[in-house]
Amino acid sequence: MNPERQYTACVAGLKEFVEGIGGRGVVLGLSGGIDSSLVACMCVDAFGTENVHGYMLPGPYSTEHSLVDAQELARNLGIRAERVSIAEAYRVFESQLSNLCPSFDRSTAGENTQARCRMIVLMALANFYGWTMVNTGNKSE
């Protein structure tokens, strides 16, 4: 299958799924990386800019460069993107889990806890506004 067909099929599947559950728009985290950039493009193609809500959710492992990339992506796509820090929420988890897991803050578990904090924020927004959360992940998550 060629890449354009694959992309079109993914956009159609995403649209069918969200519309099938009665979604009134989508929310996603914008990290500035390839995965969230591709998914943001798919969401805009499926739902239009007015129905895509992006959030930059920096934490202790985030770089300023990634936030600049996320802002540029949002600007290029014509979607609004808000910045909400998850640093305080992460610190609460870190303080509790560090008692159970040595070197928690320097581990994959620590980095992935940052992703879980982001998911909590995105799910809360989705539930509150009636949006559908669209998420990305990789093998380590």
Can you say where each PLM-predicted feature lies in the sequence?
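RNA-binding accessory domains that recognize and position tRNA/RNA substrates
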Residues: 1-27, 45
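ATP-dependent adenylation/pyrophosphate-handling site
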Residues: 24-30, 34-71
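Structured core elements
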Residues: 27-29, 38, 53-56, 80-85, ...
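Residue-level signal for inorganic ion chemistry
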Residues: 33, 74, 134
